[in-house]
């Protein structure tokens, strides 16, 4: 005797039962709308119809989606990044199918921003090129543009019809004040640019493991911004379907509540001040240990990193002789320097540089 077939009705019913439950545990492709609104307000200082966004897999994921968007819709299929820049920018954009070009940012010899070089390169680029800009706490140099320099960059980008793309991975880390750190983004919004922005919550909210980010676009109007976001969704769906839910709820809890937000702002200042005090301590210890090199740049720089000026050989010697690890371009994470290890680090740096 053959077994009875299961009823179709049963299958239909189970779909009805499970569908709403599944739905409750999923974010839509674009992510959590409450989080996107909070993120937009955090960066731009306001919400507006012509600013729309999607939740992303942290800063890296947002960069990749924007790179793919450029590859699909931007006629030039290239992007200018500062020299130097965060090492991962280059493969992210290359893997998205773009040609990566560099614009001058840092004067390695004099350890300061090469502003003339930057302006010359923006001027020389074809009209309508896309430029990646670090919104604050430039990684790895720790040197940001002044207000006046940002205004000049905004002017030239408007004149050349360039497309700005801000990467904001350290809001709150540069000055200790999240509002101040958003000033370049807000200036460009005020000045009427159309532009993209990717935000990471890895460092400022300590959410590295949760992959929390937001990719937003300032369109000429709401219709344009919504059309771009719809294309972002078209890229997200075949990449990872939809983003995770947990980390954004932490952000919503904090940024959606005035007293929690005030606490975050205070703690951010505390953290930025601690890093700055470690810069001073590191230099004081270097001088005390007998180093005659000029270390002024370490205290002039801001953000999480010291672009120390150590050569590749010196970095390797520090690793081999003292078990101190930093990137081969000499970038030291100041977040790892404490009152307990600062003397050891200074002695080790002096040992490999004397
Ligand atoms: N942009 C910059 C400039 C960064 O330094 C980083 C992280 N080091 C990121 C983006 C991406 O970080 P995440 O993917 O962890 O948000």
Predicted segments, located by residue:
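Conserved core of the PLP fold type I
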Residues: 2-15, 19, 23-161, 171-185, ...
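Short beta-strand
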Residues: 28, 198, 295-300, 325-327
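Catalytic-loop motifs flanking and including active-site residues across diverse enzymes
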Residues: 35, 62, 209, 247-250
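Walker B catalytic acidic pair
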Residues: 168
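Active-site PLP attachment segment
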Residues: 181-227, 231
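Structural signature of PLP-dependent enzymes
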Residues: 229-248, 254-283
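Conserved PLP-binding catalytic core of the aspartate aminotransferase-like
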Residues: 263-321
